[in-house]
Every structure is written in C-alpha cells, then in structure tokens.
Swiss-Prot record:
One of its GO terms (biological process) is L-histidine biosynthetic process. GO terms for molecular function: ATP binding; histidine-tRNA ligase activity. Its EC number is 6.1.1.21. The gene is hisS. Belongs to the class-II aminoacyl-tRNA synthetase family. It catalyses: tRNA(His) + L-histidine + ATP = L-histidyl-tRNA(His) + AMP + diphosphate + H(+). Transmembrane segments: none annotated. It is an enzyme of class 6 (ligase). It comes from Methanospirillum hungatei JF-1 (strain ATCC 27890 / DSM 864 / NBRC 100397 / JF-1). It comes from the Archaea. This is Histidine--tRNA ligase.
Length: 408
C-alpha cells in the first residue's frame, strides 16, 4: 500500500471544516486592519532563500533542479517571496502596502506534535511604514488574530538592538553563534560559548539582560541607544491599545533578516513546540533589486494553532438535509434539492439506488432532517419534512421548509 510521505497529513472533512472556520475568522480580522490577501508561487529561485534566510532554514529546504538547469526550492517561508513579489509587482502601489496570505510551506525537519514537513501558514507583511505606529499595528494584528481564533497564549516582545548593543565588540561569527543559541532558548550554551572565547566579562550582563522584563531594566544594563525613543513609543502605543505582553530581550529569531523589533507568541498545551507566531521588523527589498524599504510582519503556524485549540474550535451548525424519494418522485426531488441549495441549505440525494427504508437509515446517520417525497407530495406540490432528532414531521411547501431551515 502506498502511504503519504513522512511529515505530511491527510485531512478528513470534519478537520477541514474546523480549519476553514478558523481561517475565515483570521481572514476577516486581517481585512478589518486593511490587509488584503495575496498568493505567491509554491517554488521559487533557490537564491531567493539563500541570500538572507539563515543557516537553519537553508539546511532544511527542499531543493531541486528543473529541466532547464535552474536551481529551485519549495518555499520554506513566505516573507522573502512576498518581498520579491513587492519588488517585481508592487513598488508603484501606495505606501504602506498591507498584504496577508495563507500558504503551504515546506521544510525537511523531524516531524513531531504540531510540526510537519508540509505546513500551513498565515502571514501578514506591512511594507513601507518606518514608524513605531507601524511596528505596533503589526504586533496588535498578530495578537488580535490569535485572540479571534480562540487560542490561549502569551505575547513576548524584544528588540534586536538590545542584544546587538551588548555584543557590539564581538566578531560577526561569534555574534551569530550567540544569536543561534538564544533563538533555541539555550541561554546556558550561550554563556558557555562566551567563556570559551574568553569573554567572561559578558556573561553576567547577558544573564541579566536575558532576565530583564522592563525597559528600565534593559536600559540600565545596555545604556541608552539610538533606538530608545522609538522603542519606548512603540510600547506606549501597545499599552494604550490594551495589548498584554512580556518584554523579552533574549528573542533572537531564526531568520537573519530581522533588524529591529521582534516578537513571538507561545500557546499553552503544546510542550516544547509551543511557539505559534513569530515576526518582527526587517529590510529585504533591496536584496531583490528594489529600494531599501522598511517592513514588518509575522507568520502564524496554523497547524500548531489547531493543535492548541483542540476541540475548542467549532464550526457553526448548519442543518443537513437528505431527500428520500421513490422513483416516481425523483424529478420533483431534484427540483426541491436545487431550491434548497440555492438558499444555502446543505442537501443530499440518494446516489446509490437504495430502497426507501435504506435511504431513511442512511439519513439517520448523517442528516438532521429528511425531506420525504412520494406520490402524494408530487401531486400536491408539497414535501414531508421530518426532524430526525426530534422524530416529528409535517407536510409543508418547499418555501415553508426553506424558511424553517434557514432560520434554524
């Protein structure tokens, strides 16, 4: 038997309905902030991702060569493709550009709870707004989307200038190592590395900075920095908006293109793989042939959102109807089915030439109502509507049934 590839999933109708409901909530919420949905190719030129994505992601990419000898990759993330699209298609648009997307991404990593090799992401990118207000809106949108989805989570915010200032006199390679440790939340490994390279003087400040939870504590450790006024303004805007958050200077992010504010959200009940959102401010457009354009955005791991929701996610109830008929009532039944569907009622008819009793038995397993059509219903232009849960039935017109079912 041929099975699905490791790290992928099949999703049956119940799961897909739950997912589509949460997606719809998130799409609608993003639209309220002025973000419009876009789509990019599933595969891109390999160079798009090797320019600035970070070693961890580069090593996990699905890479192939096409028949023309071009090196291509299945997208491991969406920010780089979106900025490539902006440079190629959207530079003439009014700023700021507000785009969002749902899309599959692909990474060759070890599958585990909430982590797959093919995974579904929601993301949003704000392009061309270089302000504390812009940074705050992106964070607020991310928070609002998860809240709307029904997830219980914690929002943590940092700024790369905090750690960049503390580690300013380290070699670039050493900075990268420290950032990689912090991104994996391995602070002890970062301390050990500093000792190994003879920088014991940075160990205590790093420990204190990683543990700082107020801006006052942060600036007491690193001193005032050029970004201080904007950082304070951004947090003041979040406070005014009523957004709950924790300050965490240790946030590093695994992608090499972030330049300023960074933020992450962590859900309850997911164990070690509990990060469901990550984002920040970045500059990428100039790497793809455009102008140096300030941007900010985030991605939500939608699969982890669904795991975090568990059975808490719900699909609005809609009555389901099965039409039960004899051969002489078939044409009339098809007309009724068409009328029901035109009015948004989920309606099925028998496709297996079953007997009347077998049709009723099947309806009892999958439907909420049975519409019974026999010789009498055809002659009188009516239907018999049976509530399969209550066991009651009544003979009414199709219009009356539609009114009853659409108001249920």
């Amino acid at each position: 038997m041929i099975q699905k590839p490791r790290g992928t999933r099949d999703m049956l109708p119940d799961e897909m309905e739950r997912r589509r409901e949460i997606e719809a909530r998130m799409r609608a919420r993003a639209r309220l902030y002025g973000f419009r949905e876009i789509a990019t190719p599933v595969f891109e030129e390999l160079e798009l991702f090797t320019i600035r994505s970070g070693e961890g992601i580069i090593n996990e990419m699905y890479v192939f060569e096409d028949k023309g000898g071009r090196s291509l990759a299945l997208r491991p993330e969406l920010t780089a493709p979106v900025l490539r699209m902006y440079v190629e298609e959207g530079r003439s648009l009014n700023k700021p550009v507000k785009w969002c997307y749902f899309a599959d991404c692909f990474r060759y990593e070890r599958p585990q709870k909430g982590r797959y090799r093919q995974f579904w992401q929601f993301g949003a990118e704000l392009i061309g707004a270089d302000s504390a207000m812009g940074d705050a809106e992106v964070i607020t949108l991310g928070y609002d989307l998860l809240r709307t989805a029904g997830v219980t989570f914690v929002l943590r915010i940092g700024h790369l200038s905090f750690m960049r200032t503390l580690l300013a006199d380290l070699a670039d390679g050493d900075k990268k190592k420290i950032r990689a440790f912090l991104d994996k939340r391995e602070e002890e490994a970062a301390i050990t590395y500093l000792r190994d390279i003879g920088r014991d003087d940075l160990c205590d400040p790093l420990i204190r900075l990683c543990g700082a939870r107020t801006l006052e504590d942060v600036f007491a450790i690193i001193g005032e920095i050029p970004e201080a006024a904007r950082v304070r303004e951004m947090f003041a805007i979040l406070d005014a908006s009523g957004i709950p958050y924790e300050i965490n200077p240790a946030i590093a992010r695994g992608l090499d293109y972030y330049t300023g504010v960074v933020f992450e959200c962590f859900a309850e009940g997911l164990g070690a793989e509990n990060q469901i959102l990550g984002g920040g401010a970045y500059r990428l457009a100039h790497l793809f042939g455009g102008e140096d354009t300030p941007s900010a955005g985030f991605a939500i791991g939608f699969d982890r959102v669904m795991v975090a929701l568990g059975e808490a996610s719900w699909v609005p109830w809609q009555p389901q109807v099965m039409i039960i008929t004899t051969n002489e009532g078939r044409d009339y039944a098809l007309t009724i089915a068409g009328q029901f569907r035109m009015n948004g009622i989920i309606t099925e008819t028998d496709l297996m030439d079953r007997s009347f009793s077998a049709q009723m038995k099947a309806a009892g397993k999958s439907a909420d109502y049975a519409v019974i059509i026999g010789k009498d219903e055809v002659e009188t232009g009516t239907i018999t509507l049976k509530d399969l849960k209550a066991g009651t039935q009544e003979k009414i017109t199709a219009d009356e049934a539609i009114q009853k079912l659409t108001s249920a």
